[in-house]
Amino acid sequence: MNTQAKLVNELKNITTEGQNPNTLDIDLLDSLGVLKKINTEDQKVASIVGLLLPEISQGVDLIVDAFACGGRLIYIGAGTSGRLGVLDAVECPPTFSVSSEQVIGILAGGAGAMYKAVEGAEDNRQLAIDDLKAINLSSKDIVVGIAASGRTPYVISGMAFAREQGAKVIGVSCSANSSYAQNCDINICAVVGAEVLTGSTRMKSGTAQKLILNMLSTASMIRSGKSYQNLMIDVNASNKKLYARAVRIVMQATECDFDTAEMALAQANNQTKLASLMVLTGLDSTQAKAALASNKGFLRKAVEQQGC
């Protein structure tokens, strides 16, 4: 059997490549009918992800521990899966005021692959190793390998290399695959079933992966002190909208008025968490910085330490 025939045969056993019996007539429907089919399938995704909360929680714990030791969260994937990793990574600096080096998205084929497929990139095992070497992967880091099919050579190679370097590896897939599972410490496999359009894993599989990545990054940041109540207390006020959000967050966190919030932000160099602590406790910026540092950046703990 030649290589191509072998791959065709292999695809028969991949869940995401199956033909969905619920959408066999989709080409006969009007626009509303097509959308109803898509919506019905989409509604299955969140409940399936919900069954994986124990595994996702284990992943969060690994990431939190890594952050505490100076490690990074590194997503690696190809195609839609890789793009979703990049999307989650680039949102972390404005949302949580972390360095762009703390959460990294690696996409097979590089930055250009965000906009146009790079032929052969997902099949290139050495490329994944080179990409991880380029960011100086260390044993402190967490690598999340994302592949809907669970078979992408680029991703599996990256996961295997990461484990060889002593890094912990989390797998996020939508089809059970033994070689994939063997290369990760935590296997998060959301089997959402065959797609509305056969093999189009940008649909249910992509939605499931997005939900899981949202959980991994957001929960890890919350557990690292990046929220107060449910407020984005470390938002980076880097544009007019985010500055307005920062003002509003200070007002919500402290129940102060607009002028007080703006004054505190000015004194805190637009650091929302610092400004909030100053308003809540009456500390000046230097004292508030010290209080946050002694409480590892957790605003609630710093407030309680001051007896407020």
Curated annotation (Swiss-Prot):
PROSITE patterns: GCKR (PS01272), SIS (PS51464). CDD domains: SIS_Etherase. GO terms for biological process: 1,6-anhydro-N-acetyl-beta-muramic acid catabolic process; amino sugar catabolic process; N-acetylmuramic acid catabolic process; peptidoglycan turnover. GO terms for molecular function: carbohydrate derivative binding; carbon-oxygen lyase activity; ether hydrolase activity. This is N-acetylmuramic acid 6-phosphate etherase. Pfam families: GKRP-like_C (PF20741), GKRP_SIS_N (PF22645). Coiled coil: none annotated. It is an enzyme of class 4 (lyase). It comes from the Bacteria. NCBIfam families: N-acetylmuramic acid 6-phosphate etherase, PRK05441.1, PRK12570.1. It catalyses: N-acetyl-D-muramate 6-phosphate + H2O = N-acetyl-D-glucosamine 6-phosphate + (R)-lactate. Residues 63-226 form the SIS domain. Its EC number is 4.2.1.126. A lyase-type mechanism (elimination/hydration) is suggested for the cleavage of the lactyl ether bond of MurNAc 6-phosphate, with the formation of an alpha,beta-unsaturated aldehyde intermediate with (E)-stereochemistry, followed by the syn addition of water to give product. Homodimer. Specifically catalyzes the cleavage of the D-lactyl ether substituent of MurNAc 6-phosphate, producing GlcNAc 6-phosphate and D-lactate. Together with AnmK, is also required for the utilization of anhydro-N-acetylmuramic acid (anhMurNAc) either imported from the medium or derived from its own cell wall murein, and thus plays a role in cell wall recycling. Pathway: Amino-sugar metabolism; 1,6-anhydro-N-acetylmuramate degradation; Amino-sugar metabolism; N-acetylmuramate degradation; Cell wall biogenesis; peptidoglycan recycling. The active site is at E91, E122. Belongs to the GCKR-like family. MurNAc-6-P etherase subfamily. InterPro entries: Etherase_MurQ, Glucokinase_regulatory_CS, MURQ/GCKR, SIS_dom, SIS_dom_sf. Keywords: Carbohydrate metabolism, Lyase. The lineage of its organism: Bacteria, Pseudomonadati, Pseudomonadota, Gammaproteobacteria, Alteromonadales.
